[in-house]
């Protein structure tokens, strides 16, 4: 989003944008509605399934008859089609998940790049014979378990029986649940069990994270790893070897598929339709977002594919090996509901450790799928007595100020500095569970604390407010205005969207440049180290 949002502001200067960083789950939006809050005009979510999104349906517009919906290949949009034909979610450009192969290593050992599953296994065995790990994956993560499990059996999942089961699962109601079928899913687990054996998983592999598998690959000690095309694309420049993305192989080349997932899905609140001018503006923005240029901005230079007709937004060298698969539209969109992620991790790890064979894995997966699960994070932790709005006013966001006050008190600091996007929702009166507290915080932020003199604190605030000599503007929109606790500041907007720091005060008295203060800082490395700050990181 970091390239898309300023592009939209520049493209549509007549519109006032307010970007809110939310949480990567449909439950986040459900919680907003449960508190009788209004959804933003356009909402997005990366981890998506129609199953998870169903409770939001009555609050979202049907986009099936819009011009932007007509730009999609119907085969991909059908994944988001509700039983009555409504389409409320549109998929953004696709990230490609697969196997990155060190092409130079294959050439060095005269091992052919595989074109089907048997050749894939033969390549693994050939590398193992010369002391090189054939294949490795970061099995620790839920997405790796989910993607390799589904990837190993895409032909079955894309069969008539497989797509019928998926449609039934995606359209289930809160009053009922859909278990695994007895035709497709037993084969999925049989193929996954064989896949795990063929790639030679070892005890302890279920704990492998990204860095421990990436370093041997970069050092030419591993021939293939699970990764994305975006990561594979940077390998020639960063690590000095050529890498190609390989698909999830079938028995023949014609049975091979690329596993994909949208960078996010977008929907529109049905309150937008009540205002003709706003509706026209939102549809205009959506058309821009799903244009070739918009999706390129969304991708931010990463290798992606488009689900839209006649849009080619990648020139990725890592995807050249799978050009025929892309041309054949063999792009499988992963099934990615919250429960599928969770269960795939649990069952996948137990298959890796040998606790489950294919039959036991099928039974355990099915049991978890149909058994209601108590949420351990739903316990009420405290009750909030005062509500604060997230809306930006002339004095900033009251919700963000409230959070910074709480953080300053928690960490016993004299001054705290952060950003409005630290807060993803208004703070409301009522009970808070652990999960709801996490939703208030928009993400995992870098925090630091130390002793600084007033002059250093003044320099920090100048970095975060003032436009630089090269024109870089840290306050690209008002949401990026610093939020402080224990210290007040005044700025002058000398030109629209450009600010100058005028004064800093503590309890009404000027900041003492020679005094020492305990300062707590919360932000993200992306903002702190971005070139708009002239590479001046927060102290």
Where are these regions (language model features)?
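Conserved N-terminal structural module of periplasmic/extracytoplasmic solute-binding proteins
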Residues: 1-52, 65-68, 113, 360, ...
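Extracytoplasmic/periplasmic substrate-recognition and gating elements
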Residues: 10, 109, 236-300
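A structural signal for short loop-to-beta-strand junctions that line the ligand-binding cleft
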Residues: 31-34, 40-41, 69-104, 133-134, ...
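Hinge/lid segment of periplasmic solute-binding proteins
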Residues: 46-97, 112, 121, 147-148, ...
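Extracytoplasmic/periplasmic solute-binding protein
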Residues: 88-92, 121-177
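Glycine-centered hinge/linker elements that transmit conformational signals in sensory
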Residues: 170-206
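Long, aromatic- and glycine/proline-rich binding clefts that accommodate carbohydrate-like moieties
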Residues: 297-350
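Feature captures C-terminal
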Residues: 396-539
């Amino acid at each position: 989003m970091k390239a898309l949002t300023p592009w939209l502001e520049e493209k549509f200067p007549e519109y006032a944008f307010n970007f809110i960083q939310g949480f990567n789950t449909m439950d986040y939006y459900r919680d907003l509605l449960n508190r009788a809050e209004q959804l933003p005009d356009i909402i997005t979510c990366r981890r998506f399934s129609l199953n998870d999104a169903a409770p939001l349906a009555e609050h979202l517009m049907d986009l099936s008859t819009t011009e932007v919906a007509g730009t999609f290949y119907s085969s991909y949009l059908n994944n988001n089609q509700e039983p009555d034909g409504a389409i409320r979610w549109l998929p953004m450009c696709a990230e490609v998940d697969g196997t990155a192969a060190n092409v130079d290593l294959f050439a060095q050992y005269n091992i052919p790049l595989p074109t089907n599953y048997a050749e894939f296994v033969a390549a693994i065995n050939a590398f193992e014979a010369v002391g090189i790990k054939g294949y490795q994956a970061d099995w620790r993560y839920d997405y790796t378990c989910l993607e390799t499990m589904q990837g190993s059996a895409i032909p079955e999942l894309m069969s008539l029986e497989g797509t019928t089961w998926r449609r039934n699962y995606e359209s289930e109601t809160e009053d009922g649940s859909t278990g695994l079928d007895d035709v497709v899913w037993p084969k999925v687990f049989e193929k996954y069990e064989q896949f795990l054996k063929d790639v030679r998983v070892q005890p302890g592999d279920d704990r492998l994270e990204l860095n421990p598998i990436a370093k041997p690959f970069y050092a030419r000690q591993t021939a293939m790893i699970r990764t994305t095309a975006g990561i594979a694309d940077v390998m020639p420049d960063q690590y000095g070897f050529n890498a190609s993305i390989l698909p999830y192989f079938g028995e023949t080349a014609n049975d091979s598929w690329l596993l994909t997932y949208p960078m996010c899905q977008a929907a529109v609140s049905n309150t937008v339709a009540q205002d003709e001018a706003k509706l026209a503006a939102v549809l205009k923005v959506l058309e821009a977002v799903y244009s070739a240029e918009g999706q390129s901005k969304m991708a931010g230079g990463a290798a992606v594919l488009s689900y839209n007709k006649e849009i080619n937004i990648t020139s990725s060298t890592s995807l050249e090996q799978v050009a025929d698969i892309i041309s054949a539209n063999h792009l499988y969109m992963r099934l990615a509901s919250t429960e599928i992620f969770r269960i795939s991790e649990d069952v996948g790890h137990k298959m890796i450790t040998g606790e489950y064979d294919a039959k036991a894995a099928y039974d355990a997966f099915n049991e978890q799928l149909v058994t209601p699960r108590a949420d351990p994070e739903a316990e009420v932790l405290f009750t909030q007595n005062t509500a604060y709005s997230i809306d930006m006013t002339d004095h900033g966001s009251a919700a963000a100020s409230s959070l910074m006050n709480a953080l300053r008190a928690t960490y016993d600091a004299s001054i705290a500095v952060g950003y409005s996007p630290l807060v993803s929702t208004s703070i409301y009166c009522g009970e808070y569970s652990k999960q709801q507290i996490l939703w208030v915080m928009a993400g995992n932020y870098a925090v630091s604390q130390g002793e600084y003199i007033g002059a250093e604190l003044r320099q920090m605030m100048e970095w975060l407010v003032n436009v630089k000599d090269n024109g870089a503007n840290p306050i690209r929109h008002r949401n990026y205005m610093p939020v402080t606790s224990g210290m007040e500041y005044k700025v002058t907007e000398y030109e629209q969207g450009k600010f100058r720091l005028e004064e800093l005060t503590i309890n009404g008295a000027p900041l003492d440049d020679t005094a020492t203060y305990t300062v707590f800082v919360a932000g993200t490395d992306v903002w702190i180290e971005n070139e708009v700050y002239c590479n001046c990181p927060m102290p």
